[in-house]
Amino acid sequence: MSQRGNRKTQVGVVVSDKMDKTVVVRVSHLVKHPVYNKYIKRSVKYKAHDTDNSCKTGDRVLIVETRPLSKDKRWKVRQIIDRVE
């Protein structure tokens, strides 16, 4: 069995599930300001492929990098970590 190499993974929160088989995931991280040495919260939104339409808004998900699936989609949902009820 061949392995394709290490793919990037991110953990984020689903902020939109209105598209078919696509969710928008917000991934947050901390960045240190170079002058003031204060940590600032930054976030990036990724469109991720959700094959089964199983993700709902507010779910914490693990996304993995993949080949380009459309103009904006380069991530797939691997698993749902926490579900919102």
From Swiss-Prot:
Transmembrane segments: none annotated. It comes from the Bacteria. This is Small ribosomal subunit protein uS17. It holds the Pfam family Ribosomal_S17. Part of the 30S ribosomal subunit. The keyword DNA repair does not apply. CDD domains: Ribosomal_uS17. NCBIfam families: PRK05610.1, uS17_bact. Signal peptide: none annotated.
